[in-house]
UniProtKB/Swiss-Prot annotation:
It comes from Bos taurus. GO terms for molecular function: phosphatidylinositol binding. GO terms for biological process: early endosome to Golgi transport; intracellular protein transport. One of its GO terms (cellular component) is cytosol. Keywords: Endosome, Lipid-binding, Membrane, Protein transport, Transport. The gene is SNX8. This is Sorting nexin-8.
Length: 459
């Protein structure tokens, strides 16, 4: 990727200006600089990827295997009042670790930061926003759902699931989990520092990795856009189901109120008093079915919220984390690599300028030493760039492992619609016979309902 990067560039007229620019150029961040030499053996963290047989670049996972790694529940704990603010606390229980711990939102924030520090080249899902004041129940519930999606994506992610910080977050029940997480992050470097494959990542990459990366990024962007629209439509359908439930319930209550009315009839209507009494009794009885219809509609809306909308949100969170990773790759390691190359070229120009001006040997030696140091920095950047592409390739595979989840979501939606309409239809059919008493014939006998005549039809 950087062929000829260390070759000296042609001498430019502005060598003196270049020399000044070298001195002003910032060194690459510490996270990318201190690495052991390539030839020096490095003991990996116990939880890091080991070298599997075959090509370690390829993942051999199924969706079922991913989902079986863990199932983490996040539930709200009853509010605890602080001196000024109410604190929201979550009960986090892991099936895998058989643990149950209590976490605050800020604990999730530190955990998220630790993941980004340790796994900068992996998909780290975003956290929901923090809202200090005026957090209503709806916001708190939405944030709980988002935190549950976040921790489940992390707990099932191959490298994350084997790392000690995940176990620490899910099982440590001590008083200060945040300090424990920070201490863990300070003791160890990032994944590049601890992975035994990091120095050889380039050997496993396909020759057209850049083309593959561009194509995958475009494909996943399109998938994200489509599923974002599907999620929005699904949310609207759930909202309509809940509104329909509320309307049916009110409809039934109004029928019940009408049937319970005790206002006496005027004398001129006394001839029809028996008819009105029968109608009231029938209307009052219909409210039971409408309450049942409302309950069925609410159940369908709730089921689709959990089985369709929430799973679509999980899938979108995953895709968004992939998009964020692509941006980190381009704006992070690639940008730092280009800066290191630029700084190196300026040093080489400065070297040529110093030779022309016949500077003292000591200053030349210092400059040569700085150039050697910069060459080491560039070598590290190249290794990190290749390792970043290596991780990106694996994360792309992981997204494709999750793709069958979309068929599960669609199946859940269809089944919910079938079941919901089936149950609603049964209640409507049970209600129909009760309507017969509402239609009284000329001699007081019940008459079957008939469609309205054209002259009475609504226009």
């Amino acid at each position: 990727m950087t062929g000829g990067a260390m070759d000296p560039l042609p001498t430019a007229p502005g060598a003196a200006a270049a020399e000044a620019e070298v001195d002003e150029e910032a060194d690459p961040p510490a996270a990318d600089s201190p690495v052991p030499p390539v030839s020096e053996p490095r003991a990996p963290d116990a939880g890091q990827m080991q070298v599997p047989p075959g090509n370690p670049l390829l993942l051999s996972l199924t969706l079922q295997e991913l989902l079986a790694r863990d199932a983490v529940q996040v539930e709200l704990v009853p509010e605890k009042k602080g001196l000024f603010l109410k604190h929201v606390e979550y009960e986090v229980s892991s099936q895998r670790f058989k643990s149950c711990v209590y976490r605050r939102y800020n604990d999730f924030v530190v955990f998220h930061e630790t993941l980004l520090h340790k796994f900068p080249y992996r998909m780290v899902p975003a956290l929901p926003p923090k809202r200090m004041l005026g957090a209503d129940r709806e916001f708190i519930e939405a944030r709980r759902r988002a935190l549950k999606r976040f921790i489940n994506l992390v707990a099932r992610h191959p490298p994350f699931s084997e790392d000690t910080i995940l176990k620490l977050f899910l099982s440590f029940s001590g008083p200060d989990v945040q300090n424990k997480l920070k201490e863990s992050a300070q003791c160890l470097g990032d994944e590049f520092m601890n992975c035994r494959l990091a120095a050889r990542a380039k050997d496993f990459l396909p020759a057209d990795i850049q083309t593959q990366f561009a194509m995958s990024r475009e494909l996943i962007r399109n998938i994200y856009n489509s599923f974002h629209k599907l999620r929005d439509r699904a949310e609207r359908m759930v909202s309509r189901a809940i509104d329909n439930a509320a309307d049916l319930l009110i409809f039934g209550k109004e029928l019940s109120a009408l049937g319970s009315d005790t206002t006496p009839l005027p004398s001129w209507a006394s001839l029809n008093s028996s008819t009105w009494g029968s109608l009231k009794q029938a209307l009052k009885g219909l409210s039971v079915e409408f309450a049942l219809l409302a309950d069925k509609a609410a159940q369908q809306g709730k089921q689709e919220e959990n089985d369709v909308v929430e799973k679509l949100n999980l899938f979108l969170d995953l895709l968004q984390s992939y998009k964020d990773l692509c941006e980190r790759h381009e704006k992070g390691v690639l940008h730092k690599h280009q800066r290191a190359l630029h700084k190196y070229s300026l040093m080489k120009r400065q070297m040529v300028s110093a030779a022309v001006q016949s500077r003292e040997p000591e200053s030349m030696e210092q400059l040569e030493s700085r150039i050697v140091q910069q060459e080491n920095v560039i070598q590290t950047m190249e290794l990190r760039s290749h390792f970043s592409l290596y991780c990106l390739h694996q994360e792309t595979q992981l997204v494709h492992v999750y793709l069958p989840l979309t068929s599960h979501i669609l199946g859940a939606f269809v089944n919910s619609q079938i079941q919901g309409h089936k149950e609603m239809s049964k209640v409507w059919n049970d209600l129909q016979p009760k309507l017969r008493c509402l239609f009284v014939g000329p001699h007081g006998a019940p008459a079957p309902p008939r469609p309205p005549q054209d002259g009475l039809s609504a226009h």
